[in-house]
Amino acid sequence: MSMDISDFYQTFFDEADELLADMEQHLLVLQPEAPDAEQLNAIFRAAHSIKGGAGTFGFSVLQETTHLMENLLDEARRGEMQLNTDIINLFLETKDIMQEQLDAYKQSQEPDAASFDYICQALRQLALEAKGETPSAVTRLSVVAKSEPQDEQSRSQSPRRIILSRLKAGEVDLLEEELGHLTTLTDVVKGADSLSAILPGDIAEDDITAVLCFVIEADQITFETVEVSPKISTPPVLKLAAEQAPTGRVEREKTTRSNESTSIRVAVEKVDQLINLVGELVITQSMLAQRSSELDPVNHGDLITSMGQLQRNARDLQESVMSIRMMPMEYVFSRYPRLVRDLAGKLGKQVELTLVGSSTELDKSLIERIIDPLTHLVRNSLDHGIELPEKRLAAGKNSVGNLILSAEHQGGNICIEVTDDGAGLNRERILAKAASQGLTVSENMSDDEVAMLIFAPGFSTAEQVTDVSGRGVGMDVVKRNIQKMGGHVEIQSKQGTGTTIRILLPLTLAILDGMSVRVADEVFILPLNAVMESLQPREADLHPLAGGERVLEVRGEYLPIVELWKVFNVAGAKTEATQGIVVILQSGGRRYALLVDQLIGQHQVVVKNLESNYRKVPGISAATILGDGSVALIVDVSALQAINREQRMANTAA
């Protein structure tokens, strides 16, 4: 049975992505004056592994690019080339082009020829300069790059026998073919599950292992030195050779493999399917629990006890499955050291980036959606927040600005903060700009309320538009995207001191801790993280305002009242506030009182997408299935107050 090596493409793509990310992280912290040997070795190993895999799968453009970079890295780690900032920048640029080449191969396309020619010429030029050769040698760069240095070729090594054992059906012929692509094989011996051949001494064992490990494991590969003599001896029996393999190599491989973390790659679609099935199981368990609660405990005690155990097991299973989708914030944070470094250099600023809480976990779907909003906030802090070095010195600050990205869990939420010690927000300029755009403003507004004006559509106080920011099309999009994820944005700023933008998000979109409330015969779910408290209002605490609006006084704070029955036109609800219950909700830094008929209870619900199953409903974010099989709507807390205001204004105009 033949085996198609293209079956292993995805494995190479996944590993190459990880290796390129590791390479970038090491390059960003590499000190050119005194480079750390371990970091240089790690960068070299990453390039070496990518080159080997690219050669195996015939990705010649990526292989050649990586080969040129690998040679330079080898010279640097041997101390034959002195690093500087320009060289590290070139390595980072090479990494970017390698990523573009890899992405092209993923799409079954050929990489861009112009960028390939450009980066190859740049790397070859650097190689010439490192050797002290003149730029006039460019005419023969291609020959120089593709041929190994003469002194290295002269270092002949003894031929070696490679022994591959425990092979699967089809792998014997496949691996023989792949080895033939790397070098010339002699004295080939093939068994049912083994392969043996003599290799010339001009190819490194690491190169061979790097290629073969995309198909088999490292402990299936053994090398033996073959003594050079006029007469080639008969190859040893494969099984015996495997048993008599050099002890040191076997022990080293076992040690290496024992230190590796055991993990498998699973498609996200399979995880999502598993989560959906567990969600259905939880709903079924909830239905059974509701039915069993109606039974007589005396006659059905064992059944009720078993139902309690089932509930605990279902909850544990749900939490375990949900944890599979959780990813560390490091996945997001890892892209910002490069962004800050490049953008700060472009703007002529000095910035030190600090990352806090990289191990904090968040649902994969939210991780992917938070990248763009967070990137905009980081760019905004660099462009508008942190000042130029001379301005910072004039203000009595350190010339190096500080930018902090942090993440931490707060209950069932994650709090992500972007903090800078820059100029802060200019209250007067924001108010003037807001007034000129027709926004409702007042001098009595608090600093936090003024700061939230920057999230208005089209709002920008930038004196000039740059390719970094300044068009006013970003901050409102940031806010809307965060709200779509079930979160909200807060901002705190002090002029001359700095700004902190805080993003609060639920840990997952699949499970929700909610408070169920009743309005007439309808049941609604309020996200528990938005619920502050609940109370029954007194007539003395209710105060009318112009336009039919009422506010509720709670410990000296006046909160607008939103009547849920009015928002969704629910018939038969309690219309008098003193007869119902108000739930104090907080969203987007603002609080209001939501009038409902009755509180039912607090529980976890499985979130079902309403838009894909029905249509988008203003004021409703999703739906869920209750224990009795009925459907309850999950309220969009951030949208309710605005909908209530629009309805009241429409009624007044009519």
Swiss-Prot record:
Gene3D superfamilies: CheY-binding domain of CheA (3.30.70.400), Histidine kinase CheA-like, homodimeric domain (1.10.287.560), Histidine kinase-like ATPase, C-terminal domain (3.30.565.10), HPT domain (1.20.120.160), SH3 Domains (2.30.30.40). An in vitro complex of CheW/CheA(L)/CheA(S) in a 1:1:1 ratio increases the autophosphorylation of CheA and is required for the binding of CheY, the phosphorylation substrate. This complex accounts for 10% of the total number of molecules. InterPro entries: Bact_Chemotaxis_CheA (IPR051315), CheA-like_dim (IPR004105), CheA-like_homodim_sf (IPR037006), CheW-like_dom_sf (IPR036061), CheW-lke_dom (IPR002545), CheY-binding (IPR015162), CheY-binding_CheA (IPR035891), HATPase_C_sf (IPR036890). One of its GO terms (cellular component) is methyl accepting chemotaxis protein complex. GO terms for molecular function: ATP binding; phosphorelay sensor kinase activity; protein histidine kinase activity. Its EC number is 2.7.13.3. It comes from Escherichia coli (strain K12). The modification Phosphohistidine is found at H48. Pfam families: CheW (PF01584), CheY-binding (PF09078), H-kinase_dim (PF02895), HATPase_c (PF02518), Hpt (PF01627). May have three functional domains: one for interaction with CheB and CheY, a second for regulating phosphorylation and controlling the stability of the protein, and a third for receiving input signals regulating CheA activity. This is Chemotaxis protein CheA. It catalyses: ATP + protein L-histidine = ADP + protein N-phospho-L-histidine. Residues 1-105 form the HPt domain. GO terms for biological process: aerotaxis; bacterial-type flagellum-dependent swimming motility; chemotaxis; establishment of localization in cell; negative regulation of protein modification process; phosphorelay signal transduction system; positive regulation of post-translational protein modification; regulation of bacterial-type flagellum-dependent cell motility. The keyword Magnesium does not apply. Residues 257-509 form the Histidine kinase domain. It comes from the Bacteria. Its main location: cytoplasm. Keywords: ATP-binding, Chemotaxis, Cytoplasm, Kinase, Nucleotide-binding, Phosphoprotein, Transferase, Two-component regulatory system. Residues 511-646 form the CheW-like domain. It is found in: Cytoplasm. Involved in the transmission of sensory signals from the chemoreceptors to the flagellar motors. CheA is autophosphorylated; it can transfer its phosphate group to either CheB or CheY.
